[in-house]
Amino acid sequence: MKVKICGITDVETAKHACEYGADAIGFVFAESKRKITPGLAKEIIGEIPVHVFKVGVFVNESVEVIQKIAEECGLTHVQLHGDEDNHQIRRLNIPSIKAVGVALEKDIECAKKYDTDYLLFDSPKEKFHGGNGKTFSWELLAHMPNELREKTILAGGLNILNIEEAIRTVQPYMIDVSSGVETEGKKDLKKIKQFIKKAKECSK
């Protein structure tokens, strides 16, 4: 099971997460308490292994700005968490992840229209897009066709206590965590290590 740690804002946490087995590190460039500058993201990316996905999270940003930041920082993927459509997705010259809020089964059907490399299924949008620590009904994803499952990233309120059930129910390509590995709003290295270990064990 691949694991993405999102909302990283410092070199030490990023390096430790990779040492613990993280497959992807997420940098939030949209409005959020975890927002990061391109300069700091570039510094962190320069310190983590080449094979790890470096994902930039954007919300309703222009293609031009996304591409500029991606090139400046060395991002390998961009995650689109707003109302982006296929016209915008196809203009990107970098692999993409389209986030979709799931409340009903029809949300999954609608997600199939996106011409993207990966689909990230998350809890429905609130004030901030993603990172709100709330789960949704994983059963809605339990019967996906394999071709969709193979490009699915599961997010939304995941933590050490519920990832076993989440992985067993959805069997996604990757799981994504942010607030579930934080203590008082800050990334907790102990929680990151435990989360990654548990996720890898669950998928054996």
From Swiss-Prot:
One example GO MF annotation: phosphoribosylanthranilate isomerase activity
Gene3D superfamilies reported for this sequence: Aldolase class I (3.20.20.70)
Listed EC numbers: 5.3.1.24
Pfam families assigned: PRAI
Top-level taxonomic group: Bacteria
GO BP, sorted A to Z: L-tryptophan biosynthetic process
Enzyme class, spelled out: isomerase
SUPFAM superfamilies for this protein: Ribulose-phoshate binding barrel (SSF51366)
Key words, A-Z: Amino-acid biosynthesis, Aromatic amino acid biosynthesis, Isomerase, Tryptophan biosynthesis
Pathway(s) where this gene product acts: Amino-acid biosynthesis; L-tryptophan biosynthesis; L-tryptophan from chorismate: step 3/5
Catalytic activity: N-(5-phospho-beta-D-ribosyl)anthranilate = 1-(2-carboxyphenylamino)-1-deoxy-D-ribulose 5-phosphate
Similarity section: Belongs to the TrpF family.
NCBIfam families hit by this protein: PRK01222.1-3
PANTHER family noted in UniProt: N-(5'-PHOSPHORIBOSYL)ANTHRANILATE ISOMERASE
Protein name per its UniProtKB record: N-(5'-phosphoribosyl)anthranilate isomerase
Gene this chain is encoded by: trpF
